[in-house]
């Protein structure tokens, strides 16, 4: 059986999701660190133009998109499952919501002054001279990826983010995982 090779970078939340799932399923894997921003000539050549992170390589096969990667890993190692039998559809719906709505609300906060200082400077109080250029370069790169995508204005995104975090907290009331006694793809996506 071919090795699992995860192409990723350390600070990517979608990469972290897949790294955690690989650990949860106790799958051996190899790591290839890729650039955060363009140009990524090796990545684009290998993926046929896909530039997002992460992607999974198994032999000559390349799997792009973390939702697809979850399905591939589930097929390769069915236990422990990411999709509890009685909640498979719900797990997928919550994971998709987290990957889309929760993620973009969180990103709006990450590009606020305190969020960017934390993300690029290591502390919400880091001076802008320490992180400003990195944040601008990263933000410009991500803007090219988001062309045509609807975005919430920053104040609306902050309100939505707080609301989403309250909902997740409510779901965790009295239990350790979002959908019950064991982790599911929903937990890894919301993490």
Please give the residue ranges for each predicted region.
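GST-like domain detector, emphasizing the conserved glutathione-binding G-site
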Residues: 1-132, 153, 178
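GST-like fold's C-terminal all-alpha helical module
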Residues: 102-191
């Amino acid at each position: 059986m071919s090795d699992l090779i995860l192409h990723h970078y350390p600070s990517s939340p979608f990469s972290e999701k897949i790294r955690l799932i690989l650990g949860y399923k106790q799958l051996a894997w190899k790591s290839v660190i890729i650039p955060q921003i363009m140009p990524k000539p090796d990545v684009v050549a290998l993926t046929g133009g896909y530039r997002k992170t992460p992607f999974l390589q198994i032999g000559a096969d390349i799997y792009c998109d973390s939702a697809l990667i979850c399905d591939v890993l589930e097929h390769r190692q069915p236990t422990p499952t990411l999709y509890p039998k009685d909640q498979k559809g719900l797990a997928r719906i919550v994971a998709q919501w987290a990957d889309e709505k929760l993620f973009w609300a969180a990103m709006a906060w990450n590009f606020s002054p305190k969020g960017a200082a934390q993300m690029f400077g290591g502390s919400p109080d880091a001076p802008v001279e320490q992180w400003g250029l990195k944040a601008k370069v990263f933000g410009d790169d991500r803007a090219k990826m988001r062309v045509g995508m609807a975005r919430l204005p920053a104040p609306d995104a902050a309100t939505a983010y707080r609301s989403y975090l309250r909902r997740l907290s409510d779901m965790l009331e009295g239990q350790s995982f979002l959908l019950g006694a064991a982790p599911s793809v929903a937990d890894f996506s919301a993490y």
